[in-house]
């Protein structure tokens, strides 16, 4: 959940909260349509409390720090993960994590995170080593940009050679990584969402 979507999701999950695993992010705000970053402890607490209110829940299952690209500065100087640890100790968050932009940031965040959100897809696989290390250390992995932010084409690696549908080819690759806990797929189109869910179910039925 993120931004306005949290309020929408809050209405959907009313009366069935325990059936959902809810993840949100801190660090990025949209002000008048512009992206603004604030990683301060005060703003992080406000952001989490606001998410709880919008979602009408007493806890968030996962909260990730959404990096602006300067992973080292966030991790070394801003204490954002420290305030998330405090909120976790207060029972408002179950798992905390980091969504880095760099491999170095991902490796550093391994030591202070329960979960990492990492980019992985057929074209971009530089995080595979970090994913393996996360698994060894018991850190969960959520995949972002697994479908290349909607830019998949039939000439993607593996798709044209087999004649397979590119989304299913991508999902088969992602779910074939035993260290991957979940794949985050964003859309604003209900038809696309239904199609992606159907593709994921087909792939998982062959793997599991």
Predicted feature descriptions by range:
Residues 32-35, 154-156:
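Short acidic, glycine/proline-rich loop/turn micro-motifs
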Residues 1-20:
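N-terminal binding-site loop/beta-alpha segment at the start of enzyme catalytic domains
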Residues 33-45:
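Active-site pocket-shaping loop/turn-to-helix segments
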Residues 19-31, 65-66:
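A short, structured active-site edge motif that brings together acidic residues
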Residues 7-10, 47-50, 125-129:
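Alpha-helical scaffolding within the catalytic cores
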Residues 43-66, 86-90:
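CE4/NodB-like, metal-dependent polysaccharide N-deacetylase domain
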Residues 2, 12, 67-208:
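Beta/alpha (TIM)-barrel catalytic core signal, keyed to glycine-rich beta->alpha loops juxtaposed to Asp/Glu
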């Amino acid at each position: 959940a993120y931004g306005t979507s949290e309020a929408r999701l809050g209405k959907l999950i009313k009366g069935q909260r325990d059936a959902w695993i809810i993840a949100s992010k801190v660090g990025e705000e949209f002000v008048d349509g512009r992206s603004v970053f604030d990683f301060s402890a005060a703003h992080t607490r406000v952001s989490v409390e606001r998410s709880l209110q919008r979602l009408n829940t007493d806890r968030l299952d996962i909260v990730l720090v959404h990096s602006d690209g300067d992973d080292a500065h966030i991790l070394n100087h801003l204490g954002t993960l420290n305030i998330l640890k405090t909120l976790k100790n207060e029972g408002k968050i179950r798992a905390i994590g980091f969504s880095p932009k760099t491999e170095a940031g991902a490796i550093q965040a391994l030591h202070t995170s329960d979960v990492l959100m990492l980019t992985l897809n057929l074209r971009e696989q530089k995080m595979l080593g970090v994913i393996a290390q996360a698994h060894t250390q018991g850190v969960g992995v959520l995949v972002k940009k697994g479908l290349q932010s909607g830019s998949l084409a039939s000439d993607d690696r593996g798709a044209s050679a087999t004649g397979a549908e590119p989304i299913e080819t991508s999902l088969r690759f992602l779910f074939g990584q035993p260290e991957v806990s979940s794949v985050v797929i964003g859309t604003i189109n209900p038809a696309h969402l239904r199609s992606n869910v159907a593709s994921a179910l087909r792939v998982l039925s062959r793997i599991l």
